[in-house]
Regions:
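Residues at beta-strand starts and edge strands
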Residues: 21, 164, 223-225
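Acidic, glycine-rich two-metal-ion catalytic cores of nucleic acid-processing enzymes
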Residues: 33-39, 48-49, 179-250
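Conserved RNase H-like, two-metal-ion catalytic cores of nucleic-acid enzymes
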Residues: 1-115, 240, 246
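Mixed-charge, glycine-rich, non-catalytic linkers/tails in nucleic-acid processing enzymes
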Residues: 86, 91-93, 97-108, 112-117, ...
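A short linear-motif detector with a strong N-terminal bias
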Residues: 3, 20, 145-147, 205-207
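Alpha-helix initiation/capping motif
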Residues: 55, 60-70, 79, 153-157, ...
Length: 250
């Protein structure tokens, strides 16, 4: 394991990234903030035979500014939506390992099983503070990320990712309210495969029609309007029609 704490080591990593595919995982600084409004505490880069940890906003960082890297190599990530929101390395070939795991097992990978005692301690101690992950020692982030990279990479199978890329594109644009932009987060990892849409305790897919919850959302354009559309995508009735099953009325 190499902790990138000098420019020399960062240059070494940049060269290595050009040579072969690798796993790229990230730890966000704030466990509560939306990825679009968050920042990365550190990156974990796994080449199978060698691993790097790169502190970005972590307290153990060696400098304030880190250059982004471009590569033609394949990058394996645990969440392509979060990768698109914030990344250290840019590539045209990015594979989502958790999406592959979900399509094989009909459930997402359990990341929380690898959280260390240090992660739980800092989150309990600083539950009301921002950027807590910047305080968790890098060695503990490594301990958390190592098994994730290994397990997901070993089980990866290639699948179409159009759904994830489309959802991320919707997420990054946000929703305008009278006060600010707010961001939702689509969760495609449901038992039915029908994505949910929520963040920060708000279910954007089921806003109350009678208590004024919907009134705060406005068009981002001058003289613009919001148009509501209802459609049948992901509805179980569509599957019934395909296989000839008649659902009972009511």
């Amino acid at each position: 394991m190499i902790i990138v704490n000098t420019q020399k080591l960062f240059n070494q990593l940049k060269q290595h990234i050009q040579t072969k595919p690798f796993v790229l995982l990230q730890i966000y600084s704030d466990v509560k903030a939306h990825p679009q409004e968050n920042r990365v505490s550190c990156y974990y880069v796994d080449f199978q035979d060698e691993q790097y940890i790169v502190p970005i906003h972590h307290t153990e960082k060696y400098q304030d500014e880190i250059q982004m890297i471009e590569t033609n190599q394949t990058i394996f990530v645990s969440d392509i939506k979060k990768y698109k929101h914030n990344t250290l390395v840019i590539s045209k070939d990015v594979r989502d390992m958790n999406w592959s795991y979900y399509l094989q097992h009909n459930k997402p990978y359990d990341f929380e099983q690898h959280l260390t005692g240090a992660h739980h301690h800092y989150n309990r101690l600083h539950y009301n503070k921002d950027d807590v992950n910047d305080l968790v020692p890098l060695v503990k982030h490594i301990e958390y990320l190592e098994p994730i990279a290994k397990n997901l990479y070993q089980s990866y199978e290639e699948h179409d990712q159009t759904t994830l890329l489309t959802l991320q594109d919707i997420e990054r644009h946000g929703l305008r309210t009278y006060e600010k932009m707010v961001y939702s987060e689509y969760n495609p990892y449901t038992s039915t495969g029908r994505p949910s849409n929520r963040f920060g305790g708000m279910n954007f897919a089921a806003l109350n029609k009678s208590d004024g919850s919907r009134k705060e959302f406005i068009s981002r354009f001058n003289n613009g309007v919001l148009v509501e559309m209802d459609f049948d995508a992901y509805h179980l009735r569509l599957i019934g029609e395909i296989i000839g099953y008649q659902f009972p009325k009511g």
